[in-house]
Every structure is written in structure tokens, then in C-alpha cells.
Amino acid sequence: MEHVVPLSRTSRLARGGLLATAVLSMLVSVQPASAAAAPDGRRESHPITDAGGRNLSLNGTASLITWNTGRRLIQLTSAGFQQMGSAWSTERVGLDRSFETSFKVFLHSSEHGADGIAFLFQGEGPRALGGWGGGLGLRGIEKSVAVAFDTYQNTDDPNSNHLAVILAGNPDQHLATATPSIPLFGKPFLARISYNADEHRLRVYVRGLYPRAVEKLMLDENVDVAQTAGAQQGWVGFTGSTGDLVSRQDVYDWTVDAPKA
């Protein structure tokens, strides 16, 4: 399990900057082996942030934290009650094109907390932020497709350790759910999301961050991302929330392989 100590935070809002290529890579400049380069050379990995946190729009309780190793992470919630935060790349990507992203997640507090985070494709803009608690920070972001990593069992949830595909900003209805064999809370894990635009196929994989861990396919669903998000070009990023139970909800080593809009 990775262990790092936070040193400093940036300001709550960090915006601006342009991407020089068609690929976004957040917090680390190494491309995962699973994301193959396109033959036309439009896909190339590079950092989308610097020490000032440009190229990110941070909303609500989201902030950018620097660890003692120099690594930066997005903290969506800081273990306060009824928090919600979102973080978006400020550069749009083609939602009607094939896409892959990977990132590490650490959801933690002194006791089992809530509520979880989500990765979104959305067409509403870099200031989008939804509701707290079971809203996962995405409730009301209607032009969106979300993959949720949920650590609290609300009324319509199967359990307190599940993944879900959520459409149109409504976390009370799931297109699909799955229960991973690893805990989503208390230990960091790796997630990978792949979208095949030709087949409208969304796949979600998870893997623990321990020796000999194996990546597992958890969700494999048909969804037209561009149609559901209401736009051929849109934003990608994260939301997260807490309610009466709390959690520190961190995302790091975020890499995106997608055509620039």
C-alpha cells in the first residue's frame, strides 16, 4: 500500500492553460501500457498540470495537494460533513471518439466513511458540481455519463462497496452495478475505463495496489456517451461527496488517452 504525507494545497480554484497534444495525463507523465498510441500520432502522454495546478477546474471542496514525494493528487473531499467537490480538465475532449483513462483512488478516514466518487464524461462545463451525500457530487449534472465508486449503501444501492454506471446525473437509478472483490474504502486501488465509440461500449476495470494483483473487468455496458452527454465535445473529470459520514477522497496518477476536441 502506498503511503505519503501531504505537504501543501493549492487554492480551491485552478483554471486555465491549453493542452498541446490530443492526450491528457494528470499527475504523472508515464503512459500506462494498456493505452496504445494511435497510428496517426495524435495520442501522446504528458502532464496537464504544473506546480500551480493549471488546466484543472476545481469546484466545491476539491483541492490539489502536493505530497512529500512531489506527487500531486486531487482531494475531492477532506473528511468534512456534507461536502461535495469536482475536478475537470479545462480542455474539452471528443465524446464521440474512443477514449481510455486510468487513475488511482484512495478513499479513507479513521472509520468507514461515505459516500464515494465518480468519473464523468459531461457536456455541462468545467464548473459542474452536483449534490452532497448520496448525490456523489454528480446529482443534477444531467448531461453526463458517470462511473461511480460507491462506499455507502443508500436506498437504491446493492451494498456499500460497489461500482455503477449512472446516466443523466441521477444516482438513484443505475444502468448497471457490480461488486468488486477488493474494498473500495480503506486501501488504494487502480481503475481503468475504456470507451469504444464505434460499438458504444463502456468497460470498467479495477485492480488492487498490492503484489500480484490482477486487473478485473467489472462492468461492460452499451451506452452512447456523446448522445447521453448531449454534446460531441465535453469535459472529463471527477466528483465526490460526503454526508453524515465522512471520508478523504483522493485521486492521483490520472492519465487520459483521448482525442482533443
Task: Outline where the language-model segments fall.
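Secretory targeting and sorting signals
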Residues: 2-37
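Polar, low-complexity loop segments and adjacent catalytic/binding residues used for recognizing
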Residues: 36-261
